[in-house]
């Protein structure tokens, strides 16, 4: 592997990390070392103030922070070093666990001061240091031996993920970043990599917010309410100015003028059109919050017209990651399947949960406002996992059983994704699975594919070659699930109890929907598999299946077991 190969990996990986259709395991991560420090600071504040009730929330965030701190070489420590910081974190966890769910006030304030100091020292410089680190890793002149291929790419991969996180943290939208790096990859002007990389660095380090005009089209059901809203809210107009109308050539619907149509027009500054649309939508929401009587029957818009000096374009308010489970090509008929379950399965408890969850999934999918989506997806998940005993915490059951369901299916899901990926590249025949190929056939395919695919295949091969490696692979996935489920629950509490709306709600909502849909599909598979059961089934049988299977797969950790003992069928997308 030479320098040009590594540079090609950078281009391919940036596009993959930012693409909405990429498997969640390969998309940009939730945090880098800077964003996790910021998140930890907010969690410590909430812990001090009593808004966070469980030390476990703090504990999980510290564990995640330690992992990122340990890997990162760009972060600057003002008056301590990495080892001392990790020791301080360990000491705080040990002292706090002794107090159970009581706050160590002095220790928390000291740690909060330390975290805030490190965050402040790195907040404005991390992007440049991360780009410089990547450039250093991409400029290695000597050929890299095959034995060092995966470790070398692992290191580059960490900083690519950190860079993507940093772009998002600083206020870029994922859709803008994807478009930018797609052009970078395609390189239709044949610009040398060093020149293109330097230009990219200059663009992002010197980038400033631009001026945009954002227009939402409002369709009222009541013309009296439309006029009242126009009179009360300064940004609502009956028709767009002549200058704007003249500039609109491809969106004629924005030129309509009648008693029921109004336009919400706001001027905003932002780094790109995706972000400015979301910021303008927040303004629209805030104005409507104080004028409820005028917008009772108004459906919130999901798109906007965005204008600046050089273009006019339509933008969605929110871009969600792909709903479709991309490891399976065809979905099964949901309605017919549900009918057969009703007719053939003794499972009133599970069916009631399934129907309620499906109802809230549908309601969530139909919502424009992100808070309503999130809450309905969470309600649906609670319907599935709730205990009939009020003394049992639904969240504790979600945190215990949801990772078991997902970890049992993780290996098979990822292999099916690899299969589909390789078939798309015309190097794997239909009905053939990567895991069943001989080592010789695998080597042939590895020699035919691009460097990103080669890396994926070698990583998968290494993880599947020995039981201990596979166990570690599953354990890491479970840890990440526990971190993220705890994060989702914290955001749920903030949304419900504090009416707080977070910038990362879109990504978290996409993740929550994936967990919900995957669980629902597994629940349907469970009912189909047990259609001839003479025993009345309830949710404990479904959860118990995965609890036992999880224990078994930890002991008998073979590819054959992972592939044969779970079904990944798609009824809901």
Question: How should each PLM-predicted stretch be described?
Answer:
Residues 56-59, 69-90, 219, 227-245, ...:
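Extended alpha-helical regions
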Residues 3-56, 325-573:
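Amphipathic, oligomerization/interface secondary-structure segments
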Residues 61, 74, 130, 164-165, ...:
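Generic recognition of cysteine residues
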Residues 94-372, 379, 506-571:
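Charged, non-catalytic interaction/linker regions at domain boundaries
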Residues 31-133:
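N-terminal accessory alpha/beta regions
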């Amino acid at each position: 592997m030479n320098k040009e190969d590594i540079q090609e990996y950078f281009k391919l990986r940036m596009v993959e990390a930012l693409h909405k259709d990429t498997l969640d395991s390969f998309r940009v991560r939730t945090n880098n070392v800077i964003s996790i420090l910021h998140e930890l600071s907010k969690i410590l504040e909430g812990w001090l103030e009593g808004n966070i009730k469980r030390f476990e929330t703090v504990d999980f965030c510290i564990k995640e922070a330690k992992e990122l701190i340990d890997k990162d070489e760009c972060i600057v420590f003002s008056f301590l070093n990495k080892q001392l910081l990790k020791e301080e974190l360990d000491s705080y966890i040990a002292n706090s666990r002794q107090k159970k769910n009581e706050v160590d006030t002095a220790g928390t304030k000291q740690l909060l001061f330390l975290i805030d100091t490190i965050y402040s020292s790195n907040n404005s410089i991390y992007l440049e240091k991360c780009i410089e680190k990547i450039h250093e890793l991409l400029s290695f002149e000597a050929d890299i031996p095959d034995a060092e291929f995966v470790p070398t790419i692992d290191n580059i991969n960490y900083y690519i993920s950190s860079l993507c996180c940093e772009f998002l943290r600083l206020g870029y939208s994922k859709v803008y970043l994807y478009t930018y790096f797609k052009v970078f990859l395609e390189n239709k002007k044949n610009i040398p990599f060093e020149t293109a990389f330097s230009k990219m660095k200059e663009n992002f380090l010197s980038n400033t917010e631009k001026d945009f005009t954002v227009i939402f089209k409002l369709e009222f059901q009541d013309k009296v309410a439309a006029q009242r809203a126009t009179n009360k809210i300064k940004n609502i107009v009956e028709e767009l100015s002549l200058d704007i109308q003249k500039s609109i050539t491809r969106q004629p619907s924005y030129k309509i003028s009648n008693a029921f149509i109004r336009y919400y027009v706001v001027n905003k500054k932002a780094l790109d059109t995706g972000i400015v649309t979301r910021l303008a939508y927040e303004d629209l929401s805030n104005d409507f919050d104080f004028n409820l009587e005028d917008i009772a029957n108004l459906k919130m818009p999901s798109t906007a017209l965005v204008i600046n000096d050089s273009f006019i374009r339509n933008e969605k308010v929110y871009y969600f990651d792909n709903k479709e489970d991309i490891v399976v090509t065809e979905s099964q008929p949901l309605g017919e399947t549900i009918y057969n379950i009703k007719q053939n399965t003794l499972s009133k408890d599970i069916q009631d949960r399934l129907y309620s969850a499906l109802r809230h999934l549908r309601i969530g999918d139909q919502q424009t406002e992100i808070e309503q989506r999130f809450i309905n997806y969470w309600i649906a998940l609670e319907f599935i996992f709730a205990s009939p005993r009020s003394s049992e915490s639904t969240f504790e059951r979600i945190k215990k059983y949801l990772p078991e369901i997902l970890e049992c299916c993780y290996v098979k899901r990822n292999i099916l994704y690899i299969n589909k990926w390789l078939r798309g590249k015309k190097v794997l025949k239909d009905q053939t699975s990567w895991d069943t190929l001989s080592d010789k056939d695998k080597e042939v395919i590895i020699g035919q594919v691009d460097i990103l695919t080669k890396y994926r295949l070698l990583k998968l091969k290494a993880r599947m070659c020995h039981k201990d490696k596979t166990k570690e692979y599953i354990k890491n996935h479970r840890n990440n699930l526990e971190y993220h489920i705890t994060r989702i629950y914290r955001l749920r509490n903030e949304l419900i109890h504090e009416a707080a709306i977070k910038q990362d709600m879109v990504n978290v909502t996409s993740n929550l929907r994936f967990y919900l849909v995957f669980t629902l599909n597994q629940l349907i598979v469970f009912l189909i598999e047990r259609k001839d059961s003479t025993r009345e089934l309830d949710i404990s049988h479904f959860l118990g299946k995965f609890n036992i299977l999880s224990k078994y797969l930890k002991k008998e950790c073979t590819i054959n077991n992972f592939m044969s003992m779970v079904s990944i069928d798609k009824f809901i997308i």
